[in-house]
Amino acid sequence: MMDLSNLLPSVIDIARASGQVILDIYQHGQFEKQVKNDNTPVTSADLAAHKLVVERLTELTPDIPVLSEEDAGIPLSERRQWQRYWLVDPLDGTQEFIAGSGDFATIIALVADNQPVMGVVYAPISGVAYYAYHGKGAWKITPEGETVRISTHKHELPTQSIAVAISRRQDIQAITNRLDPSLNYDLVPLGSAALKSCLVAEGAVDCYLRLGPTGEWDTAATQCIVEEAGGRILNTHLTPLSYNERDTLENPNFITLGDESLPWSTILTPDNRMMEV
């Protein structure tokens, strides 16, 4: 059995090193940008961070494969042979990086038997790191170096107001159409799928409803962090996400939720909860 506690400090260091590479390019203000086959952008910062993370993880654990967003063309026939693997988004929030909002992060997950067992998220602009590994809780390292245990926000029922993290680029009407109109909602815009899920994990918001394309690398690390903090990441049928089981690496629409005692099956209006966009 792999000792995750021994691996964790090195993985955090790798995420921070990746973040520094990204930050150097971001602050310099000059970078190359291309459009990938899926019509999403990739920058020289994505590629530099990818190179660093893959090289460092391979040095750390030569026997564990690395699957990165920037090198994701490995077929399922090969991937299904992996009992465990690293799943990485070197720069989550590329559009926010390009726009200059600062909402981006490096994400590293260790997946074993189709479920994430370790997750690290590092936000270069704030200097905050989030991490968790199976059975040991979820934690946040502040810019000052203080390590604080985090947990999701628990409501006193009945609740009348729910804080919802949304993408800065999300169609707000598409979100509100899927929420019970009898409740009040505080919509909190933020870039980076990982950082929004981390807001749920630390109790800053109650949920993050994601409609639209994401990859498995966008959710694996935060699924571990959120679950260890007391929450869940579920698809819109309210069943858990899983990893490395399909030809596609694209996620379904999903919700990151903090307090499972809330009636999510009615908060997410039944007619719309089942819809995929």
Question: Residue locations for each model-derived region?
Answer:
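Acidic beta-strand-loop-alpha-helix segment within the catalytic core
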Residues: A109-C198, E245-V277
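N-terminal subdomain of lithium-sensitive/metallo-dependent phosphomonoesterases centered on the IMPase/IPPase/PAP
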Residues: M1-L91, V277
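Residue-level signal for inorganic ion chemistry
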Residues: S18, I22, D46, L57, ...
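Active-site-adjacent structural elements in enzyme catalytic cores
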Residues: L7, E55, E59, G73-G145, ...
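Oxyanion/phosphate-interacting regions
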Residues: M1-D13, G19, R178-S182, K196-V277
